[in-house]
């Protein structure tokens, strides 16, 4: 079976937004207009097609990014196609800050993105976070100012906020006609026509009109700004413009595309997905301005086993190249079992093919291959470069792994995942739950690399670690629903860390003589603090063979064995470096084990000598509140050991930014609701680790002693 759609007709894009900007509703409308779903699912009544986990439907927030394939051709009147049919692979991403990891994974495999803004709130904290992630992955994007029907909707304020908050240059390609309950449609600034939506057919039809007189001047002013930005993309167009010749419509579209792909500016359009207005303009813009796999530079990978990770193996969107793909998400499907969502970068994959997971050096075989629509699936026999598909039955593959042709191996990505900052103890209620819980936790951890499961050696408890209270709540909830595990959950605990405050040198000799072969090892270690966030490093500065090479791994193993449990309260030790500067050995009595024991004892002594101190996670907190509650909220944050960084106004609300220790933020949402009669909202994410004040450090040490 040959490729059905040429690559230039592919668009792999994601929809990214702050929680509540209307992402699921917008995706629903896209699926409805592109003919894939026949009844509109509203998040308000918990029936959206993309939100396929039961919980998402209850909580009304999107948790997992489902990948969907659908088709669209550009149309201006809703009836006449102006382009061939394009194939859209849409990845729905969550907007809640506890799920940033999901967004990170999906951005790694997207070519472009549609960023949704709430027309009233504009650029919100989570939008900024996701925007920065998209900048890091160099993802071109367009902006849809959604919810123009909301009270307080302000398109021009959103445009200004894009510039102020993200530093990007917004380029409106459409203006709303009216706002709030008077939203009639949009003005297309490229063709200079009005799109006026009619009637009850859920926005599937609209009328194209000339721009009404009272809006003509404003439309011309904004079109002028758009053209000035666009002609900067091309010298010839610039010269023609300076001579008084404006680009025609196809040229203007081509110039906007060029500017969008180079990220010189961001096209902005408007509407209301809920009121079925303006979504088709977004679909047209995806075709016109977002990249196809051919517009994206070749993906540079490195050879498996290359420690330097020199990226010198290109894989571009071409069926003739060797097969290479990235597994970016694992999901449990109640009918098919484990599904691995995979993006093909190059080559062709057929059912039954052998492939290699080059990240782990393991072989995998292609069983069932599926093209996913949010909840329905279509079995396929082969997939091509640029496709996003789901593979069933892979045994070894987890998120971020590369799958490739066994004869032409490459590793595409090393995804970095943040350290968890919050943990809870979980205990199964019955013996039967014990086994099910182990299986459930292993499955959930395979799906979500920002979630870790560990066993506390001393208490034997199972510890779940994650990115926030909501993150762990939802995982516990999924354990109950999907795996039918009943468990008791402990109170959330902070993931403290320990570090050192000064340099120290330790000379330690380990001797043991018990008849027969003894044990002997001497090590001299230099321990130094490093910059926050640098982690741990070890080097050997041994010259002249004072410690033979074969014993040095034992030294490092001994050092590492102490890192998991620091001297103050048994928390992991971070941000320090160790050098082995001298030592001594015995021809008969020395061994790797003897050096491991010596290094372990030296390290324990060294950490105490180097002034061990306790660190706690500090969260960046943003509270948005009506003005009358500002004073009380700031007072409350300060009482939680918070450092208020500043205030800002957004529309008619005040925005308070602060750094607050995580230990003092548990259950904050309830306090905030009662202080503000439910009108203030907050978001927080982990920012950095900082030293715990001495009096609190003493309390923590007593508690964990």
UniProtKB/Swiss-Prot annotation:
Residue intervals of the tr-type G domain: 8-294
Record-level GO BP terms: ribosome disassembly
A GO MF term: GTP binding
Database matches in InterPro entries: EFG_II, EFG_III, EFG_III/V, EFG_IV, EFG_V, EFG_V-like, EFTu-like_2, G_TR_CS
Cell location: Cytoplasm
Biological role stated in the UniProt entry: Catalyzes the GTP-dependent ribosomal translocation step during translation elongation. During this step, the ribosome changes from the pre-translocational (PRE) to the post-translocational (POST) state as the newly formed A-site-bound peptidyl-tRNA and P-site-bound deacylated tRNA move to the P and E sites, respectively. Catalyzes the coordinated movement of the two tRNA molecules, the mRNA and conformational changes in the ribosome.
Official protein name in the record: Elongation factor G
Annotated source species: Cereibacter sphaeroides (strain ATCC 17025 / ATH 2.4.3) (Rhodobacter sphaeroides)
Organism lineage: Bacteria, Pseudomonadati, Pseudomonadota, Alphaproteobacteria, Rhodobacterales
